[in-house]
Amino acid sequence: KDGYPMDSKGCKISCLISDTFCDTECKMKKAKSGYCYSRGLACWCEGLPENVEVWDKATNKCG
């Protein structure tokens, strides 16, 4: 699956322009790849395993 990975507080992992940083963060969660989604200023992962939690507006616990 694809989605925004979360930090330990349930927030999206923010980024500015570093695709390398996001790619590393995503691969640590077993994704195929990741990049910095500039509109959201957050990392976006592609190819995550189904059991990895991703940020969802409906279940947002960040803050």
UniProtKB/Swiss-Prot annotation:
Tissue-specific expression: Expressed by the venom gland.
GO CC annotation: extracellular region
Cleavable signal peptide: none
GO biological-process terms attached to the record: defense response
Subcellular location: Secreted
UniProt keyword list: Amidation, Disulfide bond, Ion channel impairing toxin, Neurotoxin, Secreted, Toxin, Voltage-gated sodium channel impairing toxin
Molecular function, one GO term: sodium channel inhibitor activity
Modified residues (Glycine amide): G63
Cystine pairings recorded for this chain: C11-C62, C15-C36, C22-C43, C26-C45
Domain named LCN-type CS-alpha/beta: residues: 1-63
Domain of life: Eukaryota
Family recorded in the similarity comment: Belongs to the long (4 C-C) scorpion toxin superfamily. Sodium channel inhibitor family. Beta subfamily.
Entry comment, domain topic: Has the structural arrangement of an alpha-helix connected to antiparallel beta-sheets by disulfide bonds (CS-alpha/beta).
Biological function: Beta toxins bind voltage-independently at site-4 of sodium channels (Nav) and shift the voltage of activation toward more negative potentials thereby affecting sodium channel activation and promoting spontaneous and repetitive firing. Is highly active on insects, since it provokes paralysis and death when injected into crickets.
Stated name of the protein: Ct-IT2
Organism: Centruroides tecomanus (Scorpion)
